[in-house]
């Protein structure tokens, strides 16, 4: 008798995790690869990345590759899938691949929410290279945000935090802004001496501006002793609070005992200042709210959503969660 399998994918802007899970919750394979966001790669490019990972997973699980679907159900939770039309594009491309009998495509915020709660509802805010939020009410109503950056009113995530550090360092050097230790540590991260040298390197193409994302951990470290860095972290906390507050209000859940889950690489890299500030602000807005980091990785959330649709036992889901939490690589976006 053929074993019933679930295929789970958590695809971010910097990495992709793929897992194969049996109906008993056993994790047969877990592999990691490069980013797969269709926002950057398109639907087919996204699935090319996932397809290569699937081949690796089949090898690890010692499963044959045939023309038959690999899994009965597959859950693809991807950064950059922000509109129904984008979900449809990926769904259409998946039908051609034929990896699963049934597929579910959604934004990666759903993975964080499901990883953090058994309820199936609540609010999740994800801070990775960017920032996003999802709210789900007990009756299934949803609040989502396009999360396209500045054009949809967003600030937050690793890139924005890093660029804010570059901005502050430059203004510290030329006198337009307050003095900050970022003036020294930001260029030093790139083996340069001054913010001016850093600006020249970016301007002349010797250094890609996108590498500003590397500075987020630097900002968190400096925030312990530098006021300007601390203000950047506080600004990020305020953005997380704003997203969660709006989601709660639009779902009429502000006064309810809602779980607010925080996930993503930037949350994992941050210290207690960020989560503490978010928790303090949100519990003032809604005293019954609980705010916590997700204890399980997003790939566990993607797997649990697939297993939900497969109709397996609670024990099987708990096994999958435990195994994925114990063996998943370090969190990222």
Can you annotate each of these PLM segments?
Residues 1-65, 70-71, 95-96, 115-121, ...:
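ATP-binding/phosphotransfer module of carbohydrate and carboxylate kinases, centering on a glycine-rich
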Residues 77, 106, 259-263:
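Solvent-exposed beta-strand sheet faces enriched in polar/charged residues
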Residues 81-180, 184, 328-333:
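Phosphate-binding/catalytic loop of phosphoryl-transfer enzymes
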Residues 46, 77-81, 127, 221:
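N-terminal loops that bind phosphate or other acidic moieties
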């Amino acid at each position: 008798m053929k074993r019933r399998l679930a295929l789970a994918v958590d695809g971010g802007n910097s990495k992709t995790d793929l897992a194969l899970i049996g109906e008993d919750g056993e994790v047969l394979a877990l592999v990691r690869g490069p980013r797969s966001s269709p926002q950057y790669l398109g639907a087919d490019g996204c699935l090319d990345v996932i397809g290569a990972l699937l081949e690796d997973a089949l090898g690890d699980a010692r499963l044959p590759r045939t023309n038959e679907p690999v899994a009965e159900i597959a859950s693809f939770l991807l950064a950059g899938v922000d509109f129904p039309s984008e979900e449809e594009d990926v769904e259409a491309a998946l039908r051609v691949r034929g990896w699963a009998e049934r597929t579910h495509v959604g934004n990666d915020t759903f993975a964080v929410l499901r990883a953090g709660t058994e309820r199936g509802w609540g609010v999740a805010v994800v801070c990775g290279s960017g920032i996003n939020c999802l709210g789900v009410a007990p009756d299934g109503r949803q609040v989502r945000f396009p999360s396209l950056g500045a054009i949809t009113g967003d600030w937050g995530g690793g890139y924005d935090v890093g660029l804010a550090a570059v901005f502050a360092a430059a203004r510290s050097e030329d006198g337009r802004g307050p003095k900050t230790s970022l003036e020294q540590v930001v260029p030093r991260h790139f083996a340069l001496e001054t913010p001016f040298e850093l600006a020249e390197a970016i301007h002349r193409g010797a250094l890609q501006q996108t590498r500003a994302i590397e500075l987020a951990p630097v900002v968190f470290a400096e925030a312990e002793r530098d006021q300007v860095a601390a203000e950047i972290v506080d600004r990020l906390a305020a953005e997380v609070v704003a997203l969660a507050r709006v989601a709660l209000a639009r779902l009429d859940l502000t006064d309810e005992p809602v779980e607010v889950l925080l996930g993503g690489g930037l949350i994992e890299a941050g210290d207690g200042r960020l989560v503490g500030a978010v928790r303090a602000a949100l519990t003032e807005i809604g005293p019954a709210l609980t705010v916590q980091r997700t204890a399980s990785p997003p790939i566990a959330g993607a797997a649990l959503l697939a297993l939900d649709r497969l109709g397996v036992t609670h024990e099987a889901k708990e096994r999958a969660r435990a195994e994925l939490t114990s063996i998943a690589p370090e969190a990222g976006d």
